[in-house]
């Protein structure tokens, strides 16, 4: 391990204290919530619902041609 000076050690301690205080949630709880949020947004999301892309005037309709 390399030699650290006092300011580096203080920064490391502050970072570790911050990480320790951070509230974590179980993945078994958050992953189903995330999947439900994604599934609820499918009707409104043009990236997940291709029918919405048909009404978007900014989507390219054909391939690019070089003049």
Swiss-Prot record:
Highest taxon of source: Eukaryota
Pfam families reported in the protein's UniProt record: G-gamma (PF00631)
Topological category with respect to the lipid bilayer: Lipid-anchor
Protein family according to the UniProt entry: Belongs to the G protein gamma family.
Positions of the propeptide segment: 65-67
Modification sites for Cysteine methyl ester: 64
UniProt keyword annotation of Protein transport present: no
Protein's UniProt name: Guanine nucleotide-binding protein G(I)/G(S)/G(O) subunit gamma-13
Entry's Gene Ontology molecular function annotations: G-protein beta-subunit binding
InterPro entries in alphabetical order: G-protein_gamma-like_dom (IPR015898), GGL_sf (IPR036284), GNG13 (IPR039227), Gprotein-gamma (IPR001770)
């Amino acid at each position: 391990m390399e030699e650290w000076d006092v300011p580096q050690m203080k920064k490391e301690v502050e970072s570790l204290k911050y990480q320790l205080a951070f509230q974590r949630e179980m993945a078994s709880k958050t992953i189903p919530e995330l999947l439900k949020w994604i599934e609820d947004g499918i009707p409104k999301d043009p990236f997940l619902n291709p029918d919405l892309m048909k009404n978007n005037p900014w989507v390219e309709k054909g391939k690019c041609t070089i003049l």
